Structures are given as C-alpha cells and as structure tokens.
UniProtKB/Swiss-Prot annotation:
Lineage: Bacteria, Pseudomonadati, Myxococcota, Myxococcia, Myxococcales
Organism: Anaeromyxobacter sp. (strain K)
Protein's name according to its UniProt entry: UPF0173 metal-dependent hydrolase AnaeK_1127
Gene Ontology terms for molecular function: hydrolase activity
Keywords for the protein's UniProt record, in alphabetical order: Hydrolase
Family annotation (HAMAP family): UPF0173
A Pfam family of this chain: Lactamase_B_3
Family: Belongs to the UPF0173 family.
SMART domains hit by this protein: Lactamase_B
Presence of keyword Hydrolase: yes
Length: 274
C-alpha cells in the first residue's frame, strides 16, 4: 500500500476531492424543481419562465409597468437567456433592449420587429437568424421549443425618439418545455379561429396566459370563448388593470367560464410552479 506522501496517494486524494466537489458545482446553477417549470408574472403581459433545465425566458418584458412588484427589475434579474417579444408596442417591447445588453439574452420575435429593435439598440449578435423567425416557425431555446402563432392586433414600433419602424405581424407564443408543461401566451389579440387548431397541433395546453382587459384586446367574455377553443388545464389572466381602459377582471373571466377551467391569478413577482 502506498504511503500517504507517495505520488500515487496524492493523486488518489485529488481524484476523490474532485468527485466530492462535482455535485456542489452542478448545483450552483439555480433550476426549477425537477419536472417543474416556474412562471413569474411581473404585471401586464410580462412573464419570466424558468424551465427544469435552467433556461430562463422573459416574455414581453415591460418590467417597469405600473403593476410591477418593485422598481428597477430590468437591472436586477440575475439571468435571462431569451427575450420573447410578441409585437412592437411599447408595453410589450418594454425593457427588452436594456435587459438584453445586461444579460446577453437572445431575441425571439418576428424578423421585421427584430431588425427594428436592433436599429434601436438591441445587440445585433443577440438577434440573429437562429432566433428570429415568423408565424409558424419554431425556435429551440435551451430545453424549450418556442413556436410563433397567430394573433390579431397591430405591431408598429416607435423608438425612443418617436420615429415609427416596421413591427411585422403580431403573434402569440406556444412554449413546449422538455419534461414540463406546454404554455400558450396569447400576446395581444382578439378571439380567433386559429386558436381552435392549437390542441390539434400541440396537444394539451397546460397553461394559457391570456389577455382579458378589453379595449385593445379580448375582454373576459371573448377570452372565455378562447379558453373553450384551446381547452387548457389552467388559465392565467394578464393584460388587465394596468390602465383604466383595460378594465376586464379575473372575476368576470371566472363568471364567463362558469367553472369550465381553473383560473389562477398570479401575484406579481411570486413564482408559481407548473
């Protein structure tokens, strides 16, 4: 048997130490609970989705909206891998450029809006052909597949000087998480017949993040019909109450659904596991 001071003994000790340290290094990267995906609402249409594999997606990151749980969130989020922008309006583009510059997040949106956001300061090397697409296209984002689906709205983009730029077509997102749920973020939209095709194309939608405020989008009654088309397990209302004009409420959505689906109202800033 080699002595404790022999070269073989020292190498063996180093190998044991490395193996012992490996689990600690692997656990340093924060992840959602095994098999669970965390969804955090930040008010309006802004969400953060963290997959079981640790991929972080920010959707329509207007993190400085009036319903945000605290100020300065764009400077505080520790990690974002991808930023999904449904259309070009200020309340959905939000803090995307600042967040991208700080985190290195890649942009997932339509090609036209992507080009306009690059012109407005979004880092060009984070908005390439690998993540820009168009309706019907699927982008692989870590352990999530993001498909751009139809929405009925407008999408003009105005830069910080008020100049208008192309915004392409508005869209929603279907996010299929490997080992996790299928999420549908409607974006801003009216009720559409296209929604009927989502279960056939993607299977069961687990969580539908749906606009309900009215005036610019579906109101609660229209959203309830949309829920009937999509048939999700859980409905999370969004895009309501931020401004006086978008006055639809989760209570009105519940009443219109008549118990046909679970309505779960998220508290801004509090992650929920699905």
């Amino acid at each position: 048997m080699p002595s404790a001071s022999s070269p073989r003994a020292r190498l063996a000790a180093l190998a044991v130490a490395a193996l012992a340290a490996a689990p600690l290094a692997a656990s340093a990267q924060p992840k959602a609970a095994r098999g669970k995906t965390e969804v955090t609402w930040y008010g309006h249409a802004a969400f953060l989705v963290t997959t079981p594999g640790g991929t972080v997606l920010a959707i329509d990151p207007w993190l400085s909206n009036p319903k945000a749980p605290e100020p300065g969130l764009a400077e505080k989020l520790p990690k974002v891998d991808y930023i999904l922008v449904s259309h070009g309006h200020f309340d959905h583009v939000g803090d995307a450029v600042a967040l991208a510059k700080r985190t290195g997040a890649k942009l997932i949106t339509n090609f036209d809006l992507g080009s306009s956001l690059v012109a407005a300061g979004y880092p060009k090397d984070q908005a390439g052909m690998d993540t820009l697409g168009n309706m019907g296209g699927t982008i692989q984002a870590g352990d999530a597949a993001v498909t751009m689906v139809a929405a009925v709205h407008s999408s003009g983009f105005a830069d910080d000087k008020g100049a208008a730029h192309p915004g392409g077509n508005p869209m929603g997102f279907v996010i299929q998480v490997k080992g996790g749920p299928t999420l549908y973020h409607t974006g801003d939209t009216d009720l559409t017949q296209d929604m009927k095709q989502l279960p056939e194309r993607f299977g069961r939608v687990d969580v539908m993040l749906t606009c309900i405020g009215g005036h610019f989008t579906m109101d609660p009654k229209a959203a309830a019909i949309a829920v009937g088309y999509v048939r999700p397990r859980t409905v999370v209302p969004m895009h309501f109450g931020t401004f006086p004009a978008i006055a639809g409420t989760p209570e009105e959505l519940r009443a219109a659904l008549k118990g046909k689906a679970e309505v779960r109202v998220l508290e801004p800033g509090k992650p929920v596991a699905f």
